[in-house]
């Protein structure tokens, strides 16, 4: 746990996956995580700034994929390119590096930059 809703998962295969990478500006984030040394993939659960956080900057710095709900993926693709993003719907799953990820329902609003970004997952 990296504070707030941010998590880093190091898989048994050695992959490093960040979920909701709100690092800078997150008062609970450990100082050692403010400038990650490696990011292999990013998952963003919904469009609020405290969940999207540093996803765009990290994706650019590490050329890693960002997986997000369809509507949010469209907005992120406009910033980092469609080749670095992948859309997934609630209930859908994806093989991500050495792991499998399934989006599940979450009761929460979702917007980014004033735009609706799909259901939270």
Cite the ranges covered by each PLM segment.
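Active-site-proximal beta-strand elements of phosphoester/diester hydrolases
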Residues: 1-2, 17-20, 100-106
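Metallo-beta-lactamase
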Residues: 70-121
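Pre-active-site segment of Zn-dependent metallo-hydrolases
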Residues: 8-48, 53-60, 110-118
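Metal-dependent catalytic neighborhoods of phosphoester/phosphodiester hydrolases
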Residues: 53-62, 71, 77-80
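Short internal beta-strands
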Residues: 40, 64-71
């Amino acid at each position: 746990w990296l504070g707030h809703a941010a998590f880093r998962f190091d898989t048994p295969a050695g992959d490093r996956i960040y979920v909701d990478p709100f690092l800078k500006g997150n008062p609970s984030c450990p100082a050692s995580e403010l400038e990650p040394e490696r990011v292999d993939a990013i998952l963003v659960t919904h469009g609020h700034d405290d969940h999207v956080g540093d996803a765009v900057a990290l994706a650019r710095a590490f050329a890693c994929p960002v997986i997000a709900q369809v509507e949010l993926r469209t907005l992120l693709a406009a910033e980092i390119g469609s080749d670095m993003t992948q859309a997934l719907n609630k209930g859908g799953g994806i093989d991500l590096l050495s792991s499998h990820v399934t989006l599940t329902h979450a009761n929460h609003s979702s917007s980014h930059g004033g735009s609706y970004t799909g259901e939270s997952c």
